[in-house]
A protein has these predicted regions:
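C-terminal motif of bacterial Sec signal peptides marking the signal peptidase cleavage site
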Residues: 30-31
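Fold-level signature of zinc-dependent metallopeptidase catalytic domains
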Residues: 50-67
Length: 224
């Protein structure tokens, strides 16, 4: 005769087991729920969210897959150090920069248009970062076409960064982290304007030389 494979629990044991299961489900749900931080919508309860996004690196033009792969490794390393987030960066095949993305008057590519094209591919479980060596621009501070190192939209799911205005290529990961933090955490610039903070507003004159990570204030806001 085939035996039934179950264990009979007392009422007290059943209630204890049921309570533990409910608690586990609640923790798992809270780990990936949205939360507001200092007025900014944050994708996860904290940066150790159970479901970190996949970061897709999209090279454009002559930005090679090897360059993107090296940058991806740097991002994974530094974001793990700063946020204890184990992200997976995946490099996509390079795409051409379409003429429709260019401001032909100044031979610059519109960063906002690049972001919109990337955002169309993104969802709540991934982030796209566009990579280019070409000059990119946006409308900011009363300027119709201002050259920038990078741009993100808050809230958003994509950003773009360019090496064109980065004086030291070893600082490019910092520029990329800056835009990633805007995008992933929907976090604005450092309120303290700390010159050592990666989230300091460059105000048209970016300098990442002495920036290694976030200042104490930004860490506290993001609850790191």
């Amino acid at each position: 005769m085939k035996k039934n494979c179950f264990v009979r629990l007392s009422r007290t044991e059943f209630h204890s087991f049921y309570g533990v299961m409910l608690l586990c489900c609640a923790i798992a749900f809270a780990g990936c729920s949205g939360k507001s931080v200092n007025g900014n919508s944050q994708r996860g309860d904290d940066v150790s969210c159970l479901c970190p996004p996949t970061v897709y690196l999209q090279p454009y033009g002559n930005f090679t897959k090897n360059e993107a792969s090296r940058l991806g490794k740097e991002l994974e390393k530094h974001l793990l150090e700063m946020f204890n987030v184990d992200l997976d960066c995946e490099v996509l095949p390079p795409l051409p920069l379409s003429d429709s993305l260019m401001n032909k008057a100044k031979s610059r590519y519109r960063a906002d248009k690049i972001i919109r094209s990337l955002s169309a591919k993104a969802d709540d479980h991934n982030i796209y970062i566009g990579l280019t060596h070409k000059d990119v621009s946006c409308s900011i501070r009363g300027k119709a076409d201002w050259g920038v190192q990078g741009l993100s939209l808050i809230p958003g799911k994509a950003c773009v960064v360019s090496t064109f205005r980065v004086k030291n290529r070893h600082d490019f990961w910092k520029v990329t982290c800056h835009e990633f933090i805007h995008t992933y955490f929907n976090y604005h610039h450092c309120p303290k304007n700390d010159p050592s903070c990666l989230m300091q507003d460059a105000k048209g004159h970016p300098n990442y030389k002495n920036k290694k990570g976030l200042c104490g204030y930004c860490k506290s806001v993001l609850k790191l």
